[in-house]
Swiss-Prot record:
Its main location: secreted. This is Beta-defensin 25. It comes from Mus musculus. GO terms for biological process: defense response to bacterium; innate immune response. The gene is Defb25. Keywords: Antibiotic, Antimicrobial, Defensin, Disulfide bond, Secreted, Signal. Disulfide bonds join 27-54, 34-48, 38-55. It holds the Pfam family Defensin_beta_2.
């Protein structure tokens, strides 16, 4: 009987799934993700409210505004 209780307790403990970081906080109008480090395909744009980096894919990176003197 003790083995069955131990087995049930072990299965209950192992069935608990801790929350993962699959859902990143979004930034830059939903185009970027707040992370500790950006991947090679991403660039850092600004800081998120929790002081992590707002990583934005190079395809979504906005171009720099042109200055009047550059024309």
């Amino acid at each position: 009987m003790a083995k069955w209780i131990l087995l049930i307790v072990a299965l209950l403990v192992l069935s608990h799934v801790p929350p993962g970081s699959t859902e990143f906080k979004r930034c830059w109008n939903g185009q970027g993700a707040c992370r500790t480090f950006c991947t090679r395909q991403e660039t850092f744009m600004h800081l998120c409210p929790d002081a992590s980096l707002c990583c934005l894919s190079y395809s979504f990176k906005p171009s720099r505004p042109s200055r009047v003197g550059d024309v």
